[in-house]
Amino acid sequence: MRNVFIIVILIGLVGCRNKVNKLDLPHLNGYWEIEKVTFPDGSKKEYTVNTSIDYIEVKEHEGFRKTVQPNFNGTYVTSNDAELFTIYENEGVFNLNYKTDLSEWHEKIISLSENKFIVISEENIKYHYRRFEPINLEQ
């Protein structure tokens, strides 16, 4: 009886894990703003207002991230700069591999849904994003 109890507990723990799968990756497409950053020491920085946001576009296992500034009329100011990345899976975890002329870095996707996602950097910093909702004052 004790073994059955342990098996049920283990199944529950594994089932509750928020695992990202390949079908979730298109959720990355769109405009995102940082909600908060969690540092390795446990401290957090909350972001209530963002003057710049990220636009992410993914096709298959490649994509780019571009920083844009939203306007109050629903448009965005942007530049031609973009950070290209590839997505690869390693032991069931999806990773973003960025490479620019100046740098290269990796982030693990630890949670991904239609309206939120979390990545963790190589420095063990967690970035919590929420889907950006534009403010249009001209309506």
Regions found by a protein language model. Give the residues of each.
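C-terminal motif of bacterial Sec signal peptides marking the signal peptidase cleavage site
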Residues: 12-15
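Edge beta-strand at a domain terminus
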Residues: 120-139
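Residues located in well-ordered beta-strands
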Residues: 31-33, 108, 128
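Acidic surface patches and DE-rich sequence motifs
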Residues: 39, 100, 121
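Positively charged n-region of N-terminal signal peptides that target proteins for export
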Residues: 1-5
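Contiguous, well-ordered beta-strand patches that form the walls/edges
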Residues: 61-116, 124
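Short, solvent-exposed loop/hinge segments that bridge or flank secondary-structure elements
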Residues: 34-62
